[in-house]
Amino acid sequence: MSDASLLAAAPLPSPLQALVEAGLAQRQRGYRGRFAPSPTGALHRGNLRTALLSWLHARLRGGAWLLRLDDLDTPRNRAGAETSILDDLAWLGLDWDGPVLRQSERRGLYATALSALRRQGLLYPCRCSRRLLAPISAPHGATAVYPGTCRAASGGWGPAQGRLPSWRLRLEPGRLHWLESYGAPGELDGPAAVGDVVLRRADGYLAYHLATAVDELVLGISDVVRGDDLWSATGAQVAVMAALGAAPPRYGHVPLWCDGGGRRLSKREGAEGLAAYHQLGMDAAAVVGQLAASAALVPAASRLSAAELLQQLSSERLDQVLRGAQA
């Protein structure tokens, strides 16, 4: 989970503690995976392939596969995106267990966890603006490790100059660990590679890392299969789980689908989704075949349903292919 020196677990309110304990007990009873897209647009073929791999990983192990919509960042959500996501998954035959979960309907749960961390002294207010932090931004636009500018500041939690602070999780020296099935080894230096992550933004929105960490625990998620672009986000989520006194699930970070130039497919760059396949007259069997072939699970030009693909594979074969893809 993490080195003992990294942070101390926060005492949780009894209702939240009960939910976390129930989730961890659920994890022990059997496999529970999840797919968690954000409704910021239609799923592109890279998202769809990751969904297929996650679904296969769960079903080949006789496990449950939950569908959670990470829709907390409401300004980025797009009208019709949720319906599109659900329709696309159903059309491909990727069935999920239980009702669709929406993070926007679980804000109270995340706020309770945030309050517990604050009471324990594991958070501090940060008044650094994006402009102030711009010089330490990575070249590709991601924010580099926060330098701790406000860590020792004496500012309060209220507004100053009309602006509320963000809330950061205080990480002490130590390393973060998680079980990793496919990606790079699951170990990071907390302060050097992760830093004091924001759990509540200055605009009042609860942060992705907080909500994701709480959900993995409370929902009893045992295995997370997702794109390897999220490997670097795992450390922050593991740190939050450690602060809440719980171990993380097992992770499997799988390769992303890249275009001919080696660039990963993205919504921002207009990567094609199912609409493009529909325009070509491709049915679900042809699309599943192409998605599976791109991951080296079947020969090129294969035609088969998701259920037929499931019958052809074993968990050992899937593991072998995904581990080989990372070699």
Segments (PLM) and residue ranges:
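N-terminal Rossmann-like or analogous alpha/beta NTP/dinucleotide-binding catalytic cores
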Residues: 2-141, 228-229, 233-246
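Active-site neighborhoods of enzyme catalytic cores
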Residues: 3, 81-193, 303-327
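Noncatalytic linker/hinge segments flanking ATPase motor cores
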Residues: 44, 106-111, 169, 254-255, ...
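Alpha-helix boundary recognition
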Residues: 115-118, 217, 278, 292
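Non-catalytic terminal extensions that flank enzyme cores
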Residues: 1-41, 158, 174, 263-327
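Active-site cores that bind ATP or allylic diphosphates and position pyrophosphate for catalysis
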Residues: 132-267, 273-278, 323, 327
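Short alpha-helical "patches" and their helix-cap loops
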Residues: 66-73, 253-255, 303-313
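Short helix-capping/linker segments at secondary-structure and domain boundaries
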Residues: 59-64, 219-220, 245-246, 295-302
